[in-house]
């Protein structure tokens, strides 16, 4: 394993496929990076020299990838939520944002498009108490007495 900008990259993979382990780099961008640094298609990560590794890390550090890209995406979503636009409300409700149907195939969007909530819920000591017969018995007696008075 080689660590480039804090990301573990597999030694055995070709460079163009190893670059895919970075969040924000897809196939097209990986091909573009390899072409810019003149890496051939079969060049593996373990075959890179120190000079090539430093130029690669310098090129990657100039791009918006990994944590910076995640922060930017989350800031964009929170901006949409704060201005209360249609797309922001779709994110809040966990529905598809880009106009997809909601009748059938919105299960994935309902899982992924939720805005993370940071609210915490505390339980009172009474609600954390295990339910036992001694706990339920007074309630059951009062219910039976009410039923007895009705009939």
Swiss-Prot record:
Entries under InterPro entries matching the protein: Rbsml_uS13_C, Ribosomal_uS13, Ribosomal_uS13-like_H2TH, Ribosomal_uS13_CS
Subcellular location: Mitochondrion
GO biological process, one term: mitochondrial translation
UniProt keyword terms in alphabetical order: Mitochondrion, Ribonucleoprotein, Ribosomal protein, RNA-binding, rRNA-binding
Domain of life of the organism encoding this protein: Eukaryota
Residue pairs linked by disulfide bridges in the UniProt entry: none
GO CC term, one of those recorded: mitochondrion
Gene Ontology molecular functions: rRNA binding; structural constituent of ribosome
Signal sequence interval, chain numbering: none
Primary residence: mitochondrion
Pfam family, one: Ribosomal_S13
Recorded coiled-coil stretches: none
Function: Component of the mitochondrial ribosome (mitoribosome), a dedicated translation machinery responsible for the synthesis of mitochondrial genome-encoded proteins, including at least some of the essential transmembrane subunits of the mitochondrial respiratory chain. The mitoribosomes are attached to the mitochondrial inner membrane and translation products are cotranslationally integrated into the membrane.
PANTHER family registered for this protein in UniProt: 30S RIBOSOMAL PROTEIN S13/40S RIBOSOMAL PROTEIN S18, SMALL RIBOSOMAL SUBUNIT PROTEIN US13M
HAMAP family membership: Ribosomal_uS13 (MF_01315)
Subunit-level organization: Component of the mitochondrial small ribosomal subunit (mt-SSU). Mature yeast 74S mitochondrial ribosomes consist of a small (37S) and a large (54S) subunit. The 37S small subunit contains a 15S ribosomal RNA (15S mt-rRNA) and at least 32 different proteins. The 54S large subunit contains a 21S rRNA (21S mt-rRNA) and at least 45 different proteins.
Family classification: Belongs to the universal ribosomal protein uS13 family.
Protein name (Swiss-Prot/TrEMBL): Small ribosomal subunit protein uS13m
Organism: Schizosaccharomyces pombe (strain 972 / ATCC 24843) (Fission yeast)
């Amino acid at each position: 394993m080689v660590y480039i900008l804090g990301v573990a990259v597999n030694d055995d993979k070709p460079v163009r496929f190893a670059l895919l382990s970075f969040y924000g780099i897809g196939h097209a961008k990986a091909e573009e990076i390899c072409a810019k640094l003149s890496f051939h298609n079969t060049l593996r990560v373990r075959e890179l020299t120190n000079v090539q590794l430093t130029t690669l890390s310098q090129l990657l550090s100039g791009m918006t990838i990994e944590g910076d890209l995640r922060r930017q995406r989350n800031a964009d979503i929170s901006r949409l939520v704060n201005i209360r636009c249609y797309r922001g409300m779709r994110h809040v409700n966990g529905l598809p944002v880009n106009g997809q149907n909601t009748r059938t195939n919105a299960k994935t969007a309902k899982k992924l498009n939720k805005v993370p909530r940071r609210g915490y819920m505390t339980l009172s000591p009474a609600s954390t108490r295990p339910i036992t017969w001694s706990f339920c018995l007074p309630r059951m007696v009062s219910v039976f007495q009410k039923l007895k008075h009705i009939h």
